[in-house]
Amino acid sequence: MKLRILSVGSKMPKWIDTGFNEYHKRIQPMLTTEMVDLAAAKRAKNPSEANLAQYREQEGKAILATHQSNSREKLWVLDVKGKMLSTEQLADKLSEAMQVGDDVALVIGGADGVSPEVLAAADFKWSLSPLTLPHPLVRVVLMEQLYRAMSINNNHPYHRGN
């Protein structure tokens, strides 16, 4: 299984890159992962709701163009209205995808969310938390949770949950 993280935005603070890279390095023996940075739409200073919809549409087109929909790559989208999973449930979901031979493209949308087209194309909508998290921090939290889930699946002692 290969997991690609499609993330809108780039030029993360050094501490974000450091945290992300630490878990990215740790997970590689268990799961091949790749970060794909997608350009964020250029934003106006005081955008209208119509502008925000345009940004989501532009970023959504980039996400869908990058997603390998003609392959076995499933599209998982982070969305505040998505299904919340425990770490153990995430481990099960990753295990299921591996067993059937699916690859996964996991989407971190832009600062204004994801387009309706991306949500409609999603095979799974996942909510990391009901909290509003800073966009860059999601990268670190996501990679740590993926590593923790894969540690469970590989009987690695990192996860000490129940």
From Swiss-Prot:
The keyword Methyltransferase applies. Its EC number is 2.1.1.177. GO terms for molecular function: rRNA (pseudouridine-N3-)-methyltransferase activity. It is found in: Cytoplasm. The keyword Signal does not apply. Pfam families: SPOUT_MTase. It comes from the Bacteria. Keywords: Cytoplasm, Methyltransferase, rRNA processing, S-adenosyl-L-methionine, Transferase. It catalyses: pseudouridine(1915) in 23S rRNA + S-adenosyl-L-methionine = N(3)-methylpseudouridine(1915) in 23S rRNA + S-adenosyl-L-homocysteine + H(+). It is an enzyme of class 2 (transferase). S-adenosyl-L-methionine binds at L78, G109, L128, S129, P130, L131, T132, L133. One of its GO terms (cellular component) is cytoplasm. InterPro entries: Alpha/beta_knot_MTases, RlmH-like, tRNA_m1G_MTases_N. Homodimer. Specifically methylates the pseudouridine at position 1915 (m3Psi1915) in 23S rRNA. Belongs to the RNA methyltransferase RlmH family. This is Ribosomal RNA large subunit methyltransferase H. It comes from Psychrobacter sp. (strain PRwf-1). The lineage of its organism: Bacteria, Pseudomonadati, Pseudomonadota, Gammaproteobacteria, Moraxellales. The gene is rlmH.
